[in-house]
Design a protein with these regions (language model features):
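An alpha-helical, amphipathic repeat domain used for nucleic-acid recognition
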Residues: 1-167
Length: 167
Protein backbone atom coordinates (compact mmCIF):
# COMPACT_ATOMS: atom_id res chain seq x y z
CA UNK A 1 0.00 0.00 0.00
CA UNK A 2 1.25 3.46 -0.87
CA UNK A 3 1.13 6.00 1.94
CA UNK A 4 2.78 8.92 0.23
CA UNK A 5 0.27 11.52 -0.96
CA UNK A 6 2.25 12.14 -4.16
CA UNK A 7 1.99 8.48 -5.05
CA UNK A 8 -1.80 8.75 -4.97
CA UNK A 9 -1.80 11.65 -7.43
CA UNK A 10 -2.04 9.24 -10.36
CA UNK A 11 -5.25 7.72 -9.02
CA UNK A 12 -6.62 11.09 -7.99
CA UNK A 13 -6.08 12.52 -11.48
CA UNK A 14 -7.71 9.46 -13.06
CA UNK A 15 -10.72 9.90 -10.77
CA UNK A 16 -11.00 13.62 -11.57
CA UNK A 17 -10.85 12.85 -15.28
CA UNK A 18 -13.63 10.27 -14.87
CA UNK A 19 -15.77 12.74 -12.90
CA UNK A 20 -15.24 15.45 -15.49
CA UNK A 21 -17.92 14.15 -17.85
CA UNK A 22 -20.85 13.63 -15.48
CA UNK A 23 -21.56 12.97 -11.80
CA UNK A 24 -20.68 9.44 -10.66
CA UNK A 25 -21.41 7.19 -7.73
CA UNK A 26 -18.76 5.92 -5.33
CA UNK A 27 -19.07 2.46 -6.85
CA UNK A 28 -18.61 3.75 -10.40
CA UNK A 29 -15.42 5.58 -9.41
CA UNK A 30 -14.18 2.59 -7.41
CA UNK A 31 -14.76 0.21 -10.34
CA UNK A 32 -13.13 2.62 -12.79
CA UNK A 33 -10.03 3.04 -10.63
CA UNK A 34 -9.89 -0.70 -10.01
CA UNK A 35 -9.54 -1.23 -13.76
CA UNK A 36 -6.82 1.42 -13.90
CA UNK A 37 -4.68 -0.16 -11.16
CA UNK A 38 -4.52 -3.57 -12.75
CA UNK A 39 -0.86 -4.54 -13.13
CA UNK A 40 0.33 -1.66 -10.92
CA UNK A 41 1.53 -1.41 -7.34
CA UNK A 42 -1.66 0.36 -6.18
CA UNK A 43 -4.12 -1.41 -3.92
CA UNK A 44 -7.83 -1.13 -3.17
CA UNK A 45 -6.87 0.72 0.02
CA UNK A 46 -5.31 3.41 -2.14
CA UNK A 47 -8.54 3.66 -4.12
CA UNK A 48 -10.49 4.01 -0.87
CA UNK A 49 -8.20 6.84 0.22
CA UNK A 50 -8.77 8.66 -3.07
CA UNK A 51 -12.53 8.17 -2.78
CA UNK A 52 -12.46 9.57 0.77
CA UNK A 53 -10.53 12.60 -0.47
CA UNK A 54 -13.10 13.12 -3.26
CA UNK A 55 -15.92 12.87 -0.71
CA UNK A 56 -14.20 15.45 1.52
CA UNK A 57 -13.96 17.77 -1.47
CA UNK A 58 -17.66 17.11 -2.19
CA UNK A 59 -16.84 15.81 -5.66
CA UNK A 60 -18.36 12.44 -4.84
CA UNK A 61 -21.73 12.46 -3.12
CA UNK A 62 -24.26 9.67 -3.67
CA UNK A 63 -27.14 11.71 -2.20
CA UNK A 64 -26.51 14.51 -4.67
CA UNK A 65 -26.11 11.93 -7.44
CA UNK A 66 -29.60 10.57 -6.70
CA UNK A 67 -31.10 14.06 -6.81
CA UNK A 68 -29.39 14.91 -10.09
CA UNK A 69 -30.24 11.56 -11.67
CA UNK A 70 -33.93 11.64 -10.75
CA UNK A 71 -34.22 15.30 -11.71
CA UNK A 72 -32.60 14.70 -15.10
CA UNK A 73 -34.76 11.70 -15.95
CA UNK A 74 -37.94 13.34 -14.69
CA UNK A 75 -37.43 16.16 -17.17
CA UNK A 76 -35.77 14.48 -20.15
CA UNK A 77 -36.81 10.85 -20.24
CA UNK A 78 -39.43 10.19 -17.55
CA UNK A 79 -39.37 6.78 -15.92
CA UNK A 80 -41.24 5.28 -13.01
CA UNK A 81 -39.91 5.25 -9.47
CA UNK A 82 -39.38 1.49 -9.79
CA UNK A 83 -37.17 1.82 -12.89
CA UNK A 84 -35.21 4.74 -11.43
CA UNK A 85 -34.60 2.73 -8.25
CA UNK A 86 -33.33 -0.26 -10.24
CA UNK A 87 -31.02 1.92 -12.33
CA UNK A 88 -29.62 3.62 -9.23
CA UNK A 89 -29.03 0.24 -7.59
CA UNK A 90 -27.14 -0.91 -10.71
CA UNK A 91 -24.94 2.16 -10.36
CA UNK A 92 -24.09 1.09 -6.82
CA UNK A 93 -26.17 3.55 -4.82
CA UNK A 94 -27.19 2.31 -1.37
CA UNK A 95 -30.85 1.18 -1.22
CA UNK A 96 -31.37 3.08 2.04
CA UNK A 97 -30.26 6.34 0.39
CA UNK A 98 -32.65 5.74 -2.51
CA UNK A 99 -35.58 4.96 -0.18
CA UNK A 100 -34.77 8.00 1.94
CA UNK A 101 -34.74 10.21 -1.16
CA UNK A 102 -38.12 8.96 -2.40
CA UNK A 103 -39.64 9.38 1.08
CA UNK A 104 -38.61 13.04 1.10
CA UNK A 105 -39.39 13.69 -2.57
CA UNK A 106 -42.58 12.24 -3.95
CA UNK A 107 -42.51 11.43 -7.65
CA UNK A 108 -45.86 12.03 -9.34
CA UNK A 109 -45.85 9.01 -11.62
CA UNK A 110 -49.29 9.76 -13.01
CA UNK A 111 -48.24 13.23 -14.10
CA UNK A 112 -45.02 11.92 -15.68
CA UNK A 113 -46.92 9.21 -17.54
CA UNK A 114 -49.57 11.74 -18.62
CA UNK A 115 -46.97 14.08 -20.12
CA UNK A 116 -45.19 11.22 -21.88
CA UNK A 117 -48.37 9.79 -23.33
CA UNK A 118 -49.71 13.17 -24.39
CA UNK A 119 -46.66 13.65 -26.61
CA UNK A 120 -46.84 10.13 -28.00
CA UNK A 121 -50.52 10.24 -28.88
CA UNK A 122 -49.84 13.07 -31.29
CA UNK A 123 -47.48 10.74 -33.18
CA UNK A 124 -50.04 7.96 -33.19
CA UNK A 125 -52.92 10.09 -34.46
CA UNK A 126 -53.41 8.10 -37.67
CA UNK A 127 -53.29 4.68 -36.02
CA UNK A 128 -56.58 2.98 -35.15
CA UNK A 129 -57.82 3.18 -31.57
CA UNK A 130 -57.09 -0.39 -30.54
CA UNK A 131 -53.47 -0.22 -31.70
CA UNK A 132 -53.01 3.17 -30.01
CA UNK A 133 -54.23 1.71 -26.74
CA UNK A 134 -51.84 -1.24 -27.02
CA UNK A 135 -48.98 1.11 -27.92
CA UNK A 136 -49.78 3.27 -24.89
CA UNK A 137 -49.72 0.31 -22.50
CA UNK A 138 -46.51 -1.06 -24.04
CA UNK A 139 -44.79 2.33 -24.13
CA UNK A 140 -45.50 3.20 -20.50
CA UNK A 141 -44.97 -0.38 -19.36
CA UNK A 142 -41.42 -0.31 -20.74
CA UNK A 143 -40.78 2.74 -18.60
CA UNK A 144 -41.91 0.87 -15.50
CA UNK A 145 -45.35 2.38 -14.98
CA UNK A 146 -47.92 0.03 -13.47
CA UNK A 147 -51.03 -1.15 -15.29
CA UNK A 148 -53.21 0.89 -12.93
CA UNK A 149 -51.23 4.07 -13.56
CA UNK A 150 -51.40 3.58 -17.32
CA UNK A 151 -55.14 2.95 -17.16
CA UNK A 152 -55.72 6.12 -15.09
CA UNK A 153 -53.59 8.20 -17.45
CA UNK A 154 -55.45 6.97 -20.53
CA UNK A 155 -58.78 7.76 -18.85
CA UNK A 156 -57.47 11.20 -17.90
CA UNK A 157 -56.38 11.86 -21.49
CA UNK A 158 -59.74 10.70 -22.76
CA UNK A 159 -61.59 12.99 -20.31
CA UNK A 160 -59.48 15.97 -21.30
CA UNK A 161 -60.50 15.44 -24.92
CA UNK A 162 -56.94 14.84 -26.09
CA UNK A 163 -57.79 11.35 -27.33
CA UNK A 164 -60.84 9.28 -28.06
CA UNK A 165 -60.73 5.63 -27.13
CA UNK A 166 -63.41 3.03 -26.67
CA UNK A 167 -62.10 1.17 -23.66
Amino acid sequence: MLDNQNDLQFLFKKALYFLKFRPRTKKEVFDYLLKKIRNTSYSTDDIKKVIEKLKEMDLLNDKKFIEDYVSFYSKNNPKSKKVLTLELLKKGVNKNLIDEYFLRNQLDEEELAFLLLKKRFQRWALIDKKKRLKKAFDFLGRRGFSFETVKKVIEKLEESGKIELDI
